[in-house]
C-alpha cells in the first residue's frame, strides 16, 4: 500500500535521527505535509501511520538503518554528500597569528563542570587556532570562603587532559603573593589605593551614599604604615583592607572603591600554609596576572562582566592595555545540577556518591556516564560565543554523542528483569551475531540455543507476548507463544527472517545463560538500577562504551567477579 510505503520511509528516517524512536506526530506531519492530496483522508491514514511507527520502533537502530538502506538508499547518499560542514569558531577580534595568549582560571575548590568547560575549551581552541599560548592559572587565593583543596588541583588537570586540553604553562596564584604585594604598594605610593580600617557596615553605608571613607585621602605615609601593619600582623582579620580608588559616583555601588587585599588569620592554605596572612581578592590578583602573563584575550561569562569594569582601573593607573574580553552566556544542561556549592552539600549529606555521580554535570560525571570529550567540545563550539544563556537538553548532548559512539560501540544483548522462555520443537542452533553490523572485521559473538534449556527474555517485552502471537528471537528463529506466566512457553515456527518480516512479527532479543549485570540509570535526581543478564561471553572491559541492543548505549563502570555494572548514557 502506497501510504504504508511512504510512512515507513519517514518513520525510519525519524527513528534513525532520534536514537531509534520515531515520533508518530512528526511522521504524520511529514507524510501529510509532503503529500497534501492525502489530507482529505487523514482520518483513515493516521491509524495506518501509527501502526507503521510502532513496528519501526520495535526494531533496533541497526535494523532500522538496514531497512532504510533497502528501501531508500538515497538518504545515506545525500547525507554523505553534504556531510555536515563542521561548525568552526568565528574569528577572534584583534588576534594576530602567533601572538594570542589565553588563560583559564578555575578555583580548585571543587571539580569543574560543563559550564566551566565552555571558557576552558574556547580559550584553548582559540590559542590553538592562532598558534598562540594557553595558560592554566589556578585562582587559589581565597583560603576562607572558597577554600582550595589539593585533590581538586589534580582533578582539574586530569579533566582538562581528558578534554584534550594541554596547557602550555600552569600558574598558581597562591605562589605569587609577593608579586601582588609589590603592585599593591606601588598603587598606594601612587595615591591610587589606600588602607581602610572602617567597619564593613560603616564603609557600605558611606559607599552607598557616594561619600569617601575617612581613610581615603590620608597621606601616603600613613597608608604605607597601615599597609606594613597589615603585613606584620598588627591588624587582625576584618580590621583592615586595601581598596582601589574608583569613581564614588559609579552607578554600581560594588565598583566604588572595591577591595583588593584583605587579612585572613590562620589561612592554612594547601600550598602556602600559614606563611602569608594578606591575601588578594580575585579582581586584583587576576588583573595583575593577566598583565604579567601577557594575556591578550579573556573569555568570561556574561555574569562576570563587571569584573572588567573594576580591573580597568588598575590598567589605567599603570598605563597598561587591557586584554580583549569576549563575554559569553552561561551554559547549563536541563535538569542537571552544575552548582559547586549544591554538589558539595549533596556529597556531604550522602545524597550524591561523589563528584563523578552520574546525575551531576561535572566533567567527571559526564565521562563516567559515557559522554565522549569530542561531544562536549562539539556542543560548546556549536553554542559558540553567544552572549545569551544557553540551556541544552540532555537529548541535545546525547544526539551529538550518539553519532560519535555509534561507530565504535560493540553490540551485545542485555536482558533486563529476565523471564525464562521454553521453546518446544527447536533444534540446537548457534547464532553468530556481528559485534558491529558496520564492521565485520571485528568478528562475531556466539549465542547457543540448546533444546530442553530455557532462554531468557526481558519482562519489558511481555506486552508483545500473548498466547497465539508470533515473535522473532533476534538472530535466532521465529516462535509462536503458547503460554505466558512465570515462565513463557513457546514452540518453534521457522528460521527465516523473511517470514517474520512479511508477517510484521515483532522482534525481541534474548540470552541463553548469562552473566549478572546491573545498569544504573540516572533519572533526574534518582538512580534507577535495572538488574538482568548480559551475554555470558561478552568481552567487555571497565571504561568501555558499548550498545545493549534495544536498550541503549552504556559505559561499563566496573566488573566485580562475574557481575558487570554499567551506567546508562542514552538511547
Swiss-Prot record:
GO MF annotations in UniProt: ATP binding; glutamate-tRNA ligase activity
InterPro entries: Gln/Glu-tRNA_Ligase (IPR050132), Glu-tRNA-synth_arc/euk (IPR004526), Glu/Gln-tRNA-synth (IPR000924), Glu/Gln-tRNA-synth_Ib_cat-dom (IPR020058), Glu/Gln-tRNA-synth_Ib_codon-bd (IPR020059), Rbsml_bL25/Gln-tRNA_synth_N (IPR020056), Ribosomal_bL25/Gln-tRNA_synth (IPR011035), Rossmann-like_a/b/a_fold (IPR014729)
Gene Ontology process terms (BP): amide biosynthetic process; glutamyl-tRNA aminoacylation
Cellular localisation: Cytoplasm
Keywords: Aminoacyl-tRNA synthetase, ATP-binding, Cytoplasm, Ligase, Nucleotide-binding, Protein biosynthesis
One Pfam family this sequence matches: tRNA-synt_1c
GO CC term, one of those recorded: cytosol
Role description: Catalyzes the attachment of glutamate to tRNA(Glu) in a two-step reaction: glutamate is first activated by ATP to form Glu-AMP and then transferred to the acceptor end of tRNA(Glu).
Protein family: Belongs to the class-I aminoacyl-tRNA synthetase family. Glutamate--tRNA ligase type 2 subfamily.
Protein name as catalogued: Glutamate--tRNA ligase
Organism: Pyrococcus abyssi (strain GE5 / Orsay)
Encoding gene, per UniProt annotation: gltX
Amino acid at each position: 500500500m502506497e501510504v504504508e510505503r511512504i510512512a515507513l520511509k519517514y518513520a525510519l528516517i525519524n527513528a534513525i535521527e532520534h536514537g531509534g524512536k520515531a515520533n508518530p506526530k512528526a511522521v504524520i506531519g511529514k507524510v501529510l505535509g509532503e503529500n497534501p492530496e492525502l489530507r482529505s483522508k487523514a482520518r483513515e491514514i493516521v491509524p495506518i501511520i501509527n501502526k507503521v511507527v510502532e513496528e519501526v520502533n520495535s526494531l533496533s537502530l541497526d535494523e532500522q538503518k538496514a531497512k532504510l538502506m533497502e528501501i531508500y538508499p538515497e538518504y545515506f547518499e545525500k547525507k554523505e554528500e553534504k556531510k555536515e560542514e563542521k561548525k568552526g569558531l568565528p574569528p577572534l577580534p584583534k588576534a594576530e597569528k602567533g601572538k594570542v595568549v589565553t588563560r583559564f582560571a578555575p578555583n580548585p575548590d571543587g571539580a569543574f563542570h560543563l559550564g566551566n568547560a565552555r571558557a576552558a575549551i574556547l580559550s584553548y581552541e582559540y590559542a590553538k587556532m592562532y598558534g598562540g599560548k594557553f595558560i592554566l592559572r589556578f585562582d587559589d587565593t581565597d583560603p576562607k570562603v572558597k577554600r582550595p583543596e589539593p585533590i581538586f588541583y589534580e582533578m582539574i588537570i586530569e579533566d582538562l587532559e581528558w578534554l584534550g586540553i594541554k596547557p602550555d604553562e600552569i600558574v598558581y596564584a597562591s605562589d605569587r603573593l609577593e608579586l601582588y604585594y609589590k603592585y599593591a604598594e606601588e598603587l598606594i605610593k601612587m595615591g591610587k589605593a589606600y588602607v581602610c580600617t572602617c567597619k564593613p557596615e560603616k564603609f557600605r553605608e558611606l559607599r552607598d551614599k557616594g561619600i569617601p571613607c575617612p581613610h581615603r585621602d590620608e597621606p601616603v605615609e600613613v597608608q604605607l604604615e597601615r599597609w606594613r601593619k597589615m603585613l606584620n600582623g598588627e591588624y587582625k582579620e576584618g580590621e583592615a583592607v586595601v581598596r582601589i580608588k574608583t569613581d564614588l559616583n559609579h552607578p554600581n555601588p560594588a565598583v566604588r572603591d572595591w577591595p583588593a587585599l584583605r587579612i585572613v588569620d590562620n589561612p592554612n592554605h594547601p600550598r602556602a600554609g600559614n606563611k602569608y596572612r594578606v591575601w588578594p581578592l580575585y579582581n586584583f590578583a587576576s588583573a595583575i596576572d593577566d598583565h604579567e602573563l601577557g594575556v591578550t584575550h579573556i573569555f568570561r561569562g556574561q555574569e562576570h562582566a563587571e569584573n572588567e569594569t573594576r580591573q580597568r582601573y588598575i590598567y589605567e593607573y599603570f598605563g597598561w592595555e587591557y586584554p580583549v574580553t569576549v563575554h559569553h552566556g552561561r551554559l547549563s544542561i536541563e535538569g542537571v545540577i552544575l552548582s559547586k556549592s549544591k554538589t558539595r552539600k549533596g556529597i556531604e549529606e550522602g545524597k550524591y556518591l561523589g563528584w563523578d555521580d552520574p546525575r551531576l554535570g561535572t566533567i567527571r560525571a559526564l565521562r563516567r556516564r559515557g559522554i565522549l570529550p569530542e561531544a562536549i567540545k562539539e556542543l560548546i563550539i556549536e553554542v559558540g560565543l553567544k552572549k545569551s544563556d544557553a540551556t541544552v537538553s540532555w537529548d541535545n548532548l546525547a544526539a551529538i554523542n550518539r553519532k560519535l559512539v555509534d561507530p565504535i560501540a560493540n553490540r551485545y544483548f542485555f536482558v533486563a528483569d529476565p523471564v525464562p522462555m521454553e521453546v518446544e520443537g527447536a533444534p540446537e542452533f548457534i547464532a553468530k551475531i556481528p559485534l558491529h553490523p558496520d564492521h565485520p572485521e571485528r568478528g562475531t559473538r556466539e549465542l547457543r540455543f540448546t533444546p530442553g534449556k530455557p532462554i531468557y527474555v526481558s519482562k519489558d517485552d511481555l506486552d508483545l507476548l500473548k498466547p497465539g502471537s508470533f515473535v522473532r528471537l533476534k538472530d535466532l528463529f521465529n516462535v509462536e507463544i503458547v503460554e505466558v506466566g512465570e515462565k513463557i512457553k513457546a514452540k518453534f515456527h521457522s528460521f527465516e527472517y523473511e517470514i517474520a518480516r512479511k508477517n510484521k512479527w515483532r522482534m525481541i532479543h534474548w540470552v541463553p545463560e548469562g552473566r549478572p549485570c546491573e545498569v544504573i540509570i540516572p533519572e533526574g535526581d534518582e538512580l534507577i538500577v535495572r538488574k538482568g543478564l548480559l551475554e555470558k561471553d561478552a568481552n567487555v572491559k571497565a571504561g568501555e562504551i558499548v550498545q545493549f541492543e534495544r536498550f541503549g548505549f552504556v559505559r561499563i563502570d566496573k566488573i566485580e567477579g562475574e557481575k558487570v555494572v554499567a551506567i546508562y548514557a542514552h538511547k
